[in-house]
Amino acid sequence: MILNTGARTDTVQYYSEWLLNRFKEGFVLTRNPLFPDKVTRYELTPDKIDLVLFCSKNYAPILPRLREITDKYPVYFYYTITPYGKDIEPGVPSVLESIETLKRLSAIVGRNRVAWRYDPVLLTSKYTIELHAKAFAYMAEKLAPYIDRCIFSFVELYKKLTINMPELIPMTESDKRKIADFLGKTAKHYGIRIQTCGTNGDYSEFGIHSSGCAVLSELGKANHCEFKDIKHKGMREGCHCIENRDIGAYDTCPNGCKYCYANKNPQAAMLNYQKHNPQSPLLLGEVKDTDTIIQGVQRSYLKSKYPQLSLFDMELSLIHISEPTRPEPIS
């Protein structure tokens, strides 16, 4: 089974102790968001978990103890760093701080297991196409030696977002092509593989790939293991990722990002965060007498057992971190 720790909330930034406790105890419970009295149990043992996916905007809280997970499981990390300020992402560290944290993460796990998400790309009177071009070039120069690839998507104008962000400027196809053009050129200049995620549209002419952000071939290569060749069903429309199971909960992320789809409102998320018990098998709340607990299906995608990395392998994956070669900035 592919375990996802960060699709519904920023587990790493706010619930690291809980996550580490779950791995230590060897199981986790997750409540069905549509049927709250239905609870699924997943075993978190190496024989049941093929790989652990992380997605966060701040890995600093878990870095001191990260090896408790990475020494036992194949892993892959998505680090979201965007140019938005506190007006849009009030709970997210600054770009400079995030870049330094990503470097530390990369030093621990190897650049081959770290992807930078520049996501979502949105436009307002403040965050213009020109600002994105400058910000992306700056970040790409700093991050290139420490990442496996870059993933981006254009913001989706769902109904709640138009209410939360009335300042949002709808993107035309011309806008998207302009953005894709400079993203592709900048990524190529710094030697970064760049791809879309869950975005309809073909931008291959700009050197942008359209593969899913979590595909077995890439995850296997990053972890020196081999997965079966199976169809990737995706997690939503336009998604080409492998099916995975998330153990988080909606309405629990205090980051307060205005574009977030996982929170109904920031106030509810903050209240839930304050009620969190790191000793509970559930991220939010406790098991109730009325709950029905079922054993989750944990299908393995591995073709062969995961081999432990040798020190030689780790040195090879980290070689570009110690002596990064950087091209000259785009003038």
Where are these regions (language model features)?
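Conserved Radical SAM active-site core
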Residues: 1-88, 100-106, 111, 266-316
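Conserved C-terminal portion of the radical SAM core fold
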Residues: 97-163, 181-198
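Catalytic cores of enzyme domains
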Residues: 147-250
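Peripheral terminal and linker regions in Fe-S/redox and tRNA-modifying enzymes
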Residues: 187-235, 256, 263-315
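Local cysteine-cluster metal-coordination motifs and their immediate loop/turn environment
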Residues: 245-264
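Single conserved hydrophobic/aromatic residue that forms the stacking wall/gate
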Residues: 319-331
